[in-house]
Amino acid sequence: GQQVIIPAPYWVSYPDMVSLADGEPVIVPCDEQHGWKLTPEQLAAALTPSTRWLILNSPGNPTGAIYSERELRALADVLADYPQVLVMADDIYEPLRYDNTPFTTFAQAAPQLVSRTLTVNGVSKSHAMTGWRLGYAGGPQWLIAAMQILQSQSTSNPSAISQAAAVAALNHSADFLDGWLHTLDKRRQQVLGMIAATEGLSAGIPQGAFSVFANCQRLIGRVTPTGETLRDDSGLANWLLEHTQVAVLHGSAFGMPGYLRIAYAVEDGLLTQACQRIAEACAQLR
């Protein structure tokens, strides 16, 4: 079948979306050493005559990694030899960036590949409007036309109320985003502080989005106070939920075992409680 390259860690839905479209997901594991980002060498090794798409998510979920313009250009150079391959740039977290980290979308970095690029975005993450279910895309005319046909026979169109709300949000973004990003940054620092102070956990600093991808490999194999051995990241996440009532997602769901995704887009008081409970629970493991 036709192949779609998906760098891991990835958003959990990507592989299943490809499978539902009768495609073959090709997972390429990235690593912390390279900032959780796909390298040109990895891309070149994964490409085949059957490759049809590359999915890039920047800022990324679950890691918060952001591709630089130079990194995107390097990937585009590899794709130059594969004219059948299109790129989906998932920019849904675009405005949520910390420390003045610049953002470049793939089509900007590689204008020579604009005719092969689909850029998708929305207001769900940037404007805290997940329930409004509204996104948008830009790409070559033939592809957008095909997407319109598919949507017209499935969801028909976005709610008119959602469209009006999104227009208002986008037209008044600056004031909201400044405050929202400041709040998220404080919460990011709080979670990173908890991780740094908790033996058995470690994490890089996310450049964007609103989750930390924490390494929990040193906790795997440890024993809980009730004598249960935590055999993998899923077991650890389940134990934290049952023992502390704190929900985190195991890295295996994102194609990267041995990690936990800790989201911090929650109310400050709840986040403080969650951090305390995670730290106290991890300290009980032997």
Question: Where in the sequence are the language-model features?
Answer:
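PLP-dependent class I/II
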Residues: 1-286
